[in-house]
Amino acid sequence: MLRRVLALICVAGAVCSAQDTEADRSALRTDLEPALSFEAAPSGDMPGGWTGGPAGTIFAETKIVHGGKGSVRIERNSSSGNEFSTVTKSIPIDFSGTTIEFRGFLRTEDVSGFAGLWAREDGEEPGLAFDNMQNRQLKGTTNWASYSIKLPLAAEARKLFFGILVVGTGKAWGDDLELLVDGKPVWELARTKTPETTVIDRDHQFDHGSGIVVTQLNSVQIENLATIGRVWGFLKYYHPKVTAGERHWDYDLFRILPSIVDAPDRASANASLVRWIDALGPIAACNPCAKLDSKDLTFGPDLEWIKDQQGIGSDLSRRLRSIYNNRASGLQFYVSMAPGIGNPIFKHELGYLQIKLPDAGFQLLALYRFWNIFEYWSPYRDIVGEDWNRVLKEYIPRVVLATTSGDYERELMAMIAKAHDGHANLWSALNARPPVGPCQIPVNVRFIENSPVVTAINSSTSDSAAPLKVGDVITALDGAPAVELIEKWKPYYATSNDAARMRDITHDMTRGACGDAKVGVRRDNAELALTVERVASPPHDLVAHDLNGSTFRLLSKDVAYLKLSSVKADDVPHYLHDADGTRGLVIDIRNYPSQFVVFALGSHLVNVETGFARFTGGDLSNPGAFHWISAESLPPETPHYPGKVVVLVDETSMSQAEYTAMAFRGAHAIVVGSTTSGADGNVSPFQLPGGLQTMISGIGVFYPDKTPTQRLGIKPDVEVRPTVAGIRAGRDEVLEEAVRQILGSNVSSEEIEKITKR
């Protein structure tokens, strides 16, 4: 994350500062010390002084402790919401120092993912510094042991969040925590900064629930809820009281919602909205007024609806148009732009991890928040391919009437999938995406020739998958035809195109209950019914389709091969040295690059300045408008690689991988393979109620001629797809074509197959 905006330094007089510091530090110690030792009285199941969730996974513990009388227990099973649970606390960073240390004792039992301490510093933007012990992989069953994480204290940091988390399933206990700055307990530090507070810090009316209950909806209510969803979003980004941060806009939604839900007709609901807007105060005439500059405009905000007097009434229409016409500046409380990049940074979008479902207010808030963020800040709104207004109305009853966390998460997934943005997934709740289950058949599956095909057997659990063979076409799972299951699951997979959707579905499709699974396969010309064991499967990333083994190798004296899944920018000179004298270089991006090497490598593939991308970005003064903002090019560097360059891509090539392929294509590389995932551009993350994590593509990425890449993906110059026969024979048909492009058609297929054999 980019780092900016210094916290305000306290400039009060010495006597005042000393008195404030003593009182504040005493209060901080009184609150924090018993919470860290878990000796504070619990609040229901939750340890005293802490928040966390999802509900039903965090417990105050008295039987298993490290010291004293209490500890915290995090307990997750296959039905727990989200992909992780966390107990959380926060304090203002009103002190100075060099290093924050968060340490304590942890104990685990059957943790499938990992457990750990975590801490995060936030400023104007989140994540200035972060650690969650993921790299230590604390999993399985362990006795009490001491752990520590350290963060450099950023000057911009305003708030510290910290706690304990568990990813996957299992149990973890925490106790006897300490929070230190440069070795001292935090409450012993002098107060050197005045913590900035916002209306969100002061308004706590709905911290424990919106109080809004909805058990059914009629057509009038749905229309009215769609209207307030759009009005609430418009005011969030255009009304000066909201953009200045004077209103807790989430909670203001809960204050108006009851009158909208209870309105007998559209006119009554519209009248309530008029009174709501009037209560915010008069709109001052703008001076100067913001203008929508048509220069370099790609598309403007979709605001025709505020002129629809028949639909929203003349009074409401007049007020909304007045607010729009008197917009004055680019000041935004809920969003800023990343300097030098231009993607939105979403601020003050709270995750409300503590809410208990069902809660119609918070569920509506989740829908409205995502819908409006996409409406006003997605550079690809114009190619969504859906009637985005209809999506809002369609999902109001589906999201609001969900009664369990799983149903709530799946309905949000289905709504988000309508955005057709591969970055816009419900990333923290993928365990709720069908098929659901804690176990999986230990094989890799890929969609080949319009069928799910086994492409690899997991060697560590090969006995469980013994009946299956590489090249088997899966035709059924537990008695249900695979083609029907895939169609049933498709709506929940948020991707930019079908290639990426089938990539994700085949990645998940063997999940389910642990134990035996019935699998129908087609092997050669035979239809087989097999019994295969599903086994516990920790969270894992998508499978790369590059070659196993070393990052760089010579396939022959004439062909060099470099895969980007393990590439290191510092090693580029070594790769180029070792490739010297070859006729061609294969760059395999059928993966996600381990490091950003667009310039470190790409600049050695050109001998003149070569443009390869153009970008679009949003407009803080005109939310919903997007402009061309910059272009990018490769500057030539020595040594120049003079040979032919072939880039390999497929459906696993996403985001940074696609951007890298664009750059190398600009350097006149030949792209071989199949369509990529079509999700490009720096991402802009934010939270949804329930502690759910999502994001959108934050900037538009285009070729120099303004041809889009989003949804379309990187189209190969030479299209080659793997075949079932090739998979069974252990061939890499995409790599074979790359070698053929380098060596020419005179080289026999047998020789090429020998060079590329996996």
Regions found by a protein language model. Name each.
Residues 5-14:
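Bacterial N-terminal signal peptides
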Residues 19-198:
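Extracellular and organelle-lumenal recognition/adhesion modules and their flexible linkers in secreted
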Residues 198-207, 409-460, 464, 547-554:
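PDZ/PDZ-like peptide-tail recognition elements
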Residues 209, 227-347:
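Cationic-aromatic interfacial patches
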Residues 212, 220-221, 236, 245-248, ...:
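Cleft-lining beta-strand/loop regions that shape enzyme active-site pockets
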Residues 217-221, 225-234, 303-339, 355-376, ...:
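PDZ/PDZ-like domain segments forming the peptide/carboxylate-binding groove
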Residues 231, 235-239, 256-259, 370, ...:
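Conserved PDZ fold ligand-binding element
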Residues 241-275, 377-423:
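Amphipathic alpha-helical substructures
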